[in-house]
Every structure is written in C-alpha cells, then in structure tokens.
C-alpha cells in the first residue's frame, strides 16, 4: 500500500519538478507566475504515481529500500487439507487441489481461489511483516459453490485464511483457513506461474502440461496479464 514514504517522495518530486520548470522558463521562483506550470507538473507526477502503483513498485530496483511488499502476482497451485467429514462416507475428504489467482498493485490485492466445485474471492486483506522478517497475508473471503451443489452438499459461506509468505520470489505460501460453517484446515500454495487464469479448467490444463509448457506460460510475464 502507499505509505508516508511514498507520498512524501511524490510530493517532493512535484516540488522539484515544479521549481525546475520555473527555472527553465526563466521565471522568478517566488513570482505568482509559478501557477502556470503547476498543472503540467501535477499531471506528470500523477502519471508517474499511477505507473508506479500499477507496475513499477514490483521492479527489483525498488525492492527493500523503497517498497517493502512481496510480489504475489500470478496463479498458484493450492492444496487444501480440510477437516470436513463427508456425510455420505463418514470420512474426512481427500486433499483438495485448486488454484489461487492473485492480482496485485502497490495499493490493492485481489485473491481468487478456484476448485472443481467452487470459487472464492477476497473481500478484504492485509499484508504484514512480522519481527522475524516473514511476511504474512490475511484474507477474508466469500465462497460460492457451483449452483448444482447449493442446497444439497454445500452453501455460500464466508471464511478467513492466514498464510506465511516463504522463500525468495516468493516460492510458496503456507498456513490455515477456517469458515463460518465450523470447518477448518491447512493450505499450501506453490508452483506459481505468472499468467492469471479466469477459470479452474484453464488453470488445471496449464498446470498439467509438460514442464516446458509451464515455463513458456511463466515467460509471458505478469506485467500485462496479471496486474
């Protein structure tokens, strides 16, 4: 998200650019004529801020010293271990494989989980950096099962998840989730590709292609397809 450091930097850039424009035009820096170039300068800096918020924040040159926020963009393969008991068998369900799509800017984060039977989307989120230098993301979400399952085996519900962001890149996310239906479980996200998929079937097909195909998908980049 935009912090005081970012806002101060953009304000400072505006002032410097403004004074530079006055100097180039030969205007006295304390003259009332400073108003003339101000609109141009504000528009220019506003454009820079928009580009920075959408793309440039994730560039390596800004990592660590100016932007302290992990780049989670892309599609992750998710494994869910639920404690839900299937009433038809009396047993705990097998691990559920799905795909998590993250679209991100400096100021926003959108998370979608897609499985063969339902879709979840984030309602609110927070990313924090703990004292151990590990980032953690918390998400509140709404889950909508496929229409043919509603009223039979599953209903629309809400839940929360809490994940640790691990490795350089990062490489994976691990944590747990719980729902307002009284169920809970573990979750692991790994094997990220940079492309964002809009449905479970597309993601499933891509992740089940040969490894070389996955590399080709990754090389397409997140800049255009997964903001």
Each model region followed by its residue ranges:
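Tryptophan-anchored aromatic micro-motifs
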Residues: 70-93, 113, 173-179
């Amino acid at each position: 998200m935009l912090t005081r450091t970012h806002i101060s930097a953009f304000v400072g850039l505006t002032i410097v650019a403004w004074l530079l424009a006055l100097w180039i035009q030969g205007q006295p820096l304390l003259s009332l004529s400073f108003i003339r170039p101000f609109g141009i300068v504000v528009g220019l800096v506003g454009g820079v801020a928009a580009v920075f918020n959408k793309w440039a924040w994730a560039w390596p040159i800004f990592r660590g010293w100016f932007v302290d926020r992990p780049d989670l963009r892309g599609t992750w393969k998710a494994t869910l271990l639920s404690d839900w008991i299937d009433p038809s068998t009396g047993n705990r369900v097998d691990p559920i494989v799905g795909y998590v799509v993250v679209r991100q800017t400096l100021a926003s984060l959108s998370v979608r989980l897609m499985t063969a039977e339902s879709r979840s989307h984030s309602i609110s989120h927070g990313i924090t950096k703990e004292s151990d230098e590990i980032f953690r993301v918390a998400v509140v979400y709404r889950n909508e099962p496929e229409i043919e399952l509603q009223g039979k085996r599953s209903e629309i519900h809400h839940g929360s998840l809490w994940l640790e962001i691990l490795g350089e890149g990062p490489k994976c996310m691990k944590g747990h989730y719980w729902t307002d239906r009284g169920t809970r479980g573990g979750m692991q996200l790994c094997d990220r590709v940079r492309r964002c998929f809009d449905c479970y079937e597309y993601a499933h097909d891509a992740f089940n292609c040969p490894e070389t195909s996955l590399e080709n998908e990754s090389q397409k980049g997140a800049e255009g397809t997964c903001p």
